[in-house]
C-alpha cells in the first residue's frame, strides 16, 4: 500500500497590503485532526477522499492556512515553516508528499517561501 504524507501551508499574500500577516491569523490542524477536513470544500478534503478510495495510507502532519493579507512577518514565517518541515521529517519514509500551497505567499523579506519549503524537502 502506498504511503503519502499530507500537509498544507496556504496564504495568498498581497505585497501592496501594508498590514502584515501573523501566525495568529492562521488556522491550524495537526496530526490526525487533519482527517476532520475530509468533508470540507478544500484541497485537503478532496485529497483525503481520493486517497481513501485508492487505499492509500495517509500520514497527516501539519496543515495551516490564512486568508489573503499582507506579507507574513519573518519571525512567524520562520516558525510556521519550521513546524511544517519538522512534522514532515518526523513522519518518516513515504512514497510521496502532498503539500497544499496557494502559490502566492511571501514574507516580509522572503518572496518564495513555498519554493524554499519544497527545496528543503527535496534535499
Residue ranges with predicted function:
Residues 1-54:
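N-terminal amphipathic/basic leader segments beginning at the initiator methionine
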Residues 5, 10-12, 16-18, 26-27, ...:
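Active-site histidine-anchored catalytic micro-motif
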Residues 19-35, 56-70, 113-117:
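Charged, low-complexity, helix/coiled-coil-prone segments
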Residues 49, 54-68, 75-76, 80-85:
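Low-complexity, highly charged intrinsically disordered N-terminal segments
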Amino acid at each position: 500500500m502506498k504511503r503519502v504524507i499530507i500537509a498544507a501551508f496556504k496564504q495568498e499574500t498581497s505585497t501592496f497590503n501594508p498590514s502584515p500577516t501573523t501566525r495568529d491569523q492562521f488556522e491550524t490542524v495537526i496530526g490526525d485532526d487533519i482527517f476532520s477536513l475530509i468533508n470540507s470544500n478544500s484541497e485537503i478534503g478532496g485529497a483525503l477522499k481520493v486517497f481513501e478510495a485508492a487505499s492509500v495510507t495517509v500520514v497527516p502532519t501539519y496543515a495551516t492556512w490564512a486568508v489573503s493579507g499582507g506579507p507574513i512577518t519573518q519571525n512567524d514565517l520562520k516558525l510556521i515553516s519550521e513546524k511544517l518541515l519538522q512534522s514532515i521529517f518526523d513522519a518518516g519514509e513515504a512514497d510521496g508528499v502532498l503539500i497544499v500551497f496557494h502559490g502566492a505567499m511571501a514574507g516580509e523579506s522572503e518572496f518564495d517561501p513555498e519554493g524554499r519549503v519544497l527545496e528543503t524537502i527535496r534535499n
